[in-house]
Amino acid sequence: MKQTGLLALLACMLATNSPVFAADLKPMPKDAKVYIIWPQDGQVIPGGKFWVRMGLSGAGVAPAGIDKPFTGHQHLLVDTDLPPLDEEIPNDKNHLHYGLGQTEARLELPPGRHTLQLLFADEGHVPHDPPLYSKKITIIVPP
């Protein structure tokens, strides 16, 4: 009997140690979507300097820190896979945050093949339920 109680207590402690619970994810309309307007998949970008134009439908844009229903802001994933969709999105060279509500951004990438993908998140940089992310595209910066 004591062992069962101890296991239950341990399970509760481990569960409450996670940063976000699924029930805490902000809802998003099922028909909402994010997409990359430009560049297009397979685009060749001479010089490596370009604007990324970000699209959103079925939801609204709000800066980080502003909690309004069905809103959030964009994050651009560069040369990386989607992070865990129930945690805060990292902020590093591969996870670019546009917390002011930007819908376009200037990038400069070195020569090579690069992937780009958008991930929409709430005021605390956590993806919604269901999560909104674009198709991953590949661009090429020639030498």
What function would you assign to each model-found segment?
Residues 7-17:
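Bacterial N-terminal signal peptides
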Residues 130-143:
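Short beta-strand elements
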Residues 66-74, 133:
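Short coil-to-beta strand junction motifs in C2/discoidin
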Residues 55-66:
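Short amphipathic, basic-aromatic surface patches that mediate peripheral association
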